[in-house]
Amino acid sequence: MGPLSRDAWAQRLGAFRASPSAFMAGPEGEDLGRDLLSDLRSEKLSEQTKVSLLALSMEYPAQLWPDASAAEVAATSLLDTLVLLPPRPSALRRPLLLAATTALAAGGALGPTSGASCRLLPLLLGLAAGSDLGRGFVPASEQRPLQATACECLRELESCKPGLLGGSLGLLRGLLGQEGPVQPLSLLLALALRNTLVLQSRVGAGLGGLLTDKVSPTGGGPWDWTLVEEGDGRLQPQAPSWPAAEEGEGERSLTAREHSPEEARELRAAVIQLLDTSYLLTPVAQAQLLWLLGWALRGLQGQPPALFKPQLVRLLGTAQLTLLHAMLALKAAFGEALFTAQDEALLLRRLTLAAQHPALPPPTHLFYLHCVLSFPENWPLGPEGEEAAPLLLGPQLCRGLLPSLLHDPMALLARLHLLCLLCAEEEEEEKGQLPSPRHYLEELLAGLRQRAALDGGPRALATLCFQASYLVACCLAGQPTVLTPLIHGLAQLYQARPMLAPHFVDLLDQVDSELREPLKVVLRQVVVSRPGRDEALCWHLQMLAKVADGDAQSATLNFLQAAAAHCTNWDLQQGLLRVCRALLRAGVRGGLVDLLQVLARQLEDPDGRDHARLYYILLAHLAAPKLGVALGPSLAAPALASSLVAENQGFVAALMVQEAPALVRLSLGSHRVKGPLPVLKLQPEALEPIYSLELRFRVEGQLYAPLEAVHVPCLCPGRPARPLLLPLQPRCPAPARLDVHALYTTSTGLTCHAHLPPLFVNFADLFLPFPQPPEGAGLGFFEELWDSCLPEGAESRVWCPLGPQGLEGLVSRHLEPFVVVAQPPTSYCVAIHLPPDSKLLLRLEAALADGVPVALRTDDWAVLPLAGDYLRGLAAAV
């Protein structure tokens, strides 16, 4: 089939982008990558269409090249297309370089044994160096763009394989001083330098002459794959993340590293060279460069952080957020070794003033507030109980950062966090100056509670109030002077608006005991002081179920007895029973017995009466420890026919599909060789009774068509199950791995899913016999098949070892269904049909004591290595 037209490709790409997985599983998915590579060389397609094809290959490399071999083939084809381009300017050179790099990196094919890698790496290094590659390969008008693109490609490969460019440091350093794209070269050199320093420290080696050696980009290659293997592809993080600058790398990269005086001098010169040209870079690139160099030099002996001082002076007044973030990352990395006290005070003042600018958009405003909050000197550095470092952030400095009810919620919470930092300081406030931070905090919280208490007020106001209360409780947990008014204020809020009970329950679940226990006492007092016929009875019962315990038993029971007469619907009755359950677990007995007897007789709902009767029986027959165990969370799944599920497990868990250990085992049975398709015979075995079992199978790659699920109504342990038949639809005759997923229902009614061990389809599992020829025509039939394989097919000869069973035993055990002509015990002709449309023919003749020569013919050359491995392994197969 010839190349597709532009419209046909547009339609095909549109269908692919709409659903890549569905397209690749369809009939056109298998040929998409091959057609794309082929049509890139077609003269009928415009360059614009080819660029769109290359863009697709860069966006979806995993779908187009699913494994390393496919990625290797794709990269080789892309490089061939690049070489075949005419010497005139073309819009395809840069996309082809990027596409080849993406294919190798994403497909996992980059390595010393990859032919495409050995072609691409010298090409990229030569382009980055601006070398003359001959044959007018790089037109003059494309010199700088291609040089920049080559640097970007090398940076991507260095990121995938850290240490790859360790031998090119001297060359890259020399290129930085020449005319060329400064930004790509700077970032490439910084990344390669960072990776090399970290990896060399792991093996205890120095830089040697790496920073001074000028290797030839077209020579044998400066690639150090041993250093790449040491890196193992896991040098993270690649982006600024402070204050834990090296959290992802671990302690090994933080160990002090010392170089020889000559190495230290060359390293210092390289870093200074990069820093001196950093002002030519964009703000984002400058930030990345500073981060890479900061991480590289942190922990290096003989490399003072003062190298960054000129950049620090330049950046202290920057308005670029990315550069400010990079500067704070340097502060987190080097601390006082780079920043003086004056620098820290100036930087903090700069942050606080910038955060007060009225024209800042909300994200920028929150960023400045986050920087102020994360400023290292704003946090106590000593352990609890010891004197901590004083805060640089004082009331005078952050006067304009105090929170107000007029701020939006996120800004208010961030400013409230700052206010909590001020309140945590125990320094006395000077009279006549600002009001006390704690007094301001109490007024702010009172205002938030007042807004949350408004009847009909928006839910967001109540949510903000509880978020602020939680933040204060976390920051000031050890200060009773703050927590006491907070507790009483929250109690007044509940008294004014009981419908906020769910918020209180959530707050009690989240806070520590310093706030939780006294708040529970106050809330219980508020609830039991209300009349039992209150219109907010449902909220009171919900709150009481959370705060009820063994204290104040009489007041709680009196409230419940008064409320029982007003619990006329199912919701209220269930709420009342939940409070009784909480009292049972708390060890309350006494008057609870009488209350449960009354409820067992008077409740209208039969389910409620059953609950009350059950609680009464448990209370009468179990001691307190056993009662707590009986009413506690159960590890066993309860029966689903009762609403008791809502108490022990919840309806949500009963209705959701839960992940669970596999309760079914799956094994492969004997191979079935009948029918038009190969069929796997599966033998299931259940560990527990399961129902409505559905087995789903997924084949890695595009080797087979999607497999249908297999359904089993019931499986029980100890009871033999019927074998399951799984038809296979191979798209090519090759072994495969089947991932198995089980979905089933347990005897308790829960729906669970589990991943089973994978199943492996062997080459022999695909064998099918040809139709049996008429009697006496077997030899002619086989010879006709034998001759039809050539010249398009392939043939080979293999030595097949024989075990003690001899040739006749080997054939009868493994190949008997496929024998067309037999002259036992010395000669056999075997014809095997391999779906979808291939054949494998074997002649086994002149057997010796230890083996037999086998002549093979097939119309599919890819079958030969599989057939050879299969025949050589027959003797070992028992």
Curated annotation (Swiss-Prot):
Cellular component terms (Gene Ontology): AP-5 adaptor complex; AP-type membrane coat adaptor complex; late endosome; lysosomal membrane
Keywords in UniProt for this one?
A: Protein transport, Transport
- What PANTHER family has UniProt attached to this entry? AP-5 COMPLEX SUBUNIT BETA-1 (PTHR34033:SF1)
Q: What quaternary structure, including any partners, is listed in this protein's UniProt entry?
A: Probably part of the adaptor protein complex 5 (AP-5), a tetramer composed of AP5B1, AP5M1, AP5S1 and AP5Z1. Interacts with ZFYVE26 and SPG11.
Residue numbers spanned by region Disordered = 234-260
Q: Where does this protein have compositionally biased stretches of type Basic and acidic residues?
A: 250-260
Q: Can you name the source organism?
A: Homo sapiens
Q: What does this protein do?
A: As part of AP-5, a probable fifth adaptor protein complex it may be involved in endosomal transport.
Q: Which InterPro entries match?
A: AP5B1, AP5B1_barrel, AP5B1_C, AP5B1_middle, AP5B1_N
Pfam families noted in UniProt: AP5B1_barrel, AP5B1_C, AP5B1_middle, AP5B1_N
Name under which the protein is recorded: AP-5 complex subunit beta-1
List GO BP terms, alphabetically: endosomal transport; protein transport; vesicle-mediated transport
